[in-house]
Amino acid sequence: IQSQIPELCELTFYYMDLVTVARLQRNPTVKSEIQMRNFEASIPVGFFTYPISQAADITAFKATTVPVGEDQLPMIEQTREIVRKFNSVYDEVLVEPSALISTNQACLRLPGIDGKAKMSKSLGNCIYLSDSEADVKKKIMSMYTDPEHLLISDPGHLEGNTVFTYLDAFCKPEHFERYLPDYANLDELKAHYTRGGLGDVKVKKFLNNIIQEELEPIRKRRKEYEKDIPEVYNILRKGTEAAREVAAQTLSEVKSAMKINYFDDVELIKAQSEKYKGI
């Protein structure tokens, strides 16, 4: 749990001297989030410096590869800049990470169910792993599609159609055999939709079956853990303690490189002792 690892806050503080305000303002992800959250008039400092905090989250554990969506690539690049700057100014302590992005283009920037922005908890346009089967179905059936596709006979558009974006991300060939045997593959389904004669409801029901299948083993496992909440906290506690040990080691190396590990620098203490001996 991030908030239980204070070493991350200290690393963030040290990294702040390596980044300018102008550089943060140029971060495309930050600019986009500022507009989306209506922060133009008054930007919270904590939000503005989030890329630096994220750099601490990554470098504290010396991650070499970070799986991200397309919108987070600027954050990874900012982290890489911080690492290079620190290693250049002080010592080769930090590991420069690389981004790992999906080869499935639809997964790079999965929109929210409203089709207006990326899926985000704060925007309330998410499908949660904890959602019930009924909640998931309700959300999928309310998904944004093509506003001009009013009648089944109308030709539909795929661009900006959230349902088809999700199908691009999650649909597999075997899903047609199980849930929609009238079609051989997604291309056939898309072709039918674009020429007209295929309704949104049928497509949404197909997507619902796919997402429900994806989430069912997660729900099952969650229900088992819900029976023993103390064990859940025990797992979280152990994981946090293990993470804190790693972060503490990185922080120690960072402070040593910066020459601010005053009470642990045996060589410094020895040198000072020799310097003032006999005075």
Model segments located where?
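Divalent-metal (Mg2+/Mn2+/Ca2+)-assisted nucleotide/phosphate chemistry catalytic cores
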Residues: 1-115
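Conserved nucleotide- and phosphate/pyrophosphate-binding catalytic cores
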Residues: 80-279
